[in-house]
Amino acid sequence: MYQPVIISSGLVGWQFMQRTYDQQLSTFNDSAEIKRDTDYFVQNIGSIETAKDLVSDRRLLTVALGAFGLQDDIDNRYFIEKMLSDGTTATDALANRFSDSRYTDFSAAFGLGPSEARGALSTGFAEEIVTAFQANSFEIATGNQDDDMRIALYAERTLPAVVGGTGSETTKWFSIMGQAPLRSLFETAFGLPEAFGQAD
């Protein structure tokens, strides 16, 4: 698989990444493993009707979770199935209990809860999920060489949506603190102790 090129850390490395990002991402997306998984997702996601269907297909679930940065939950099948089958419309739904908005976004996108419209039936849904999966996978590959660069790429991609969201300032702050890469960025930028994210 293609490994991102990082010439150095710090500002020089970031500027190089900014200049070469589109080309590097395109090359990364053409890697056999990424292409195989994303092609499979596009061809098969339309047949998913229930949460159980999705968690039963590891290849589909890999792309689905990876699109939301939740790839570490791949082996928590019962947890993911429960989250998807609960949906997000009920206030006591599992996804709504987390400060990390990625879980709510994930469940809402697939729409497999009670009385929810299945996301897979929406025009452009598969392509949108694939694009997010590719970006997140590239960030992970970048982080294998330079974790600070990964955090910067993740923040550049996700922070505008958090800041531009409709929630209160408190909600936005909790959303930032609930996402490990963003929390790490803010802890470093403001010199906050690691325990700050766990403070009530």
Where on the chain are the PLM-derived regions?
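Short, recurring structural edge motifs at helix starts
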Residues: 46-53, 90-95, 158-164, 169-176
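The feature marks the first
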Residues: 20-75
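Extracellular/secretory-pathway and virion-surface proteins
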Residues: 122-167, 193
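Exposed alpha-helical structural elements
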Residues: 16, 37-40, 50, 79, ...
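Short, compositionally biased, intrinsically disordered N-terminal export/targeting signals
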Residues: 1-32
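Extended intrinsically disordered, low-complexity coil regions enriched in Ser, Thr, Gly, Ala
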Residues: 56-62, 66-86, 174, 178-200
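Alpha-helix boundary/N-cap detector
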Residues: 29-32, 36, 59, 97-101, ...
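Hydrophobic, ordered structural segments
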Residues: 69-75, 82-136
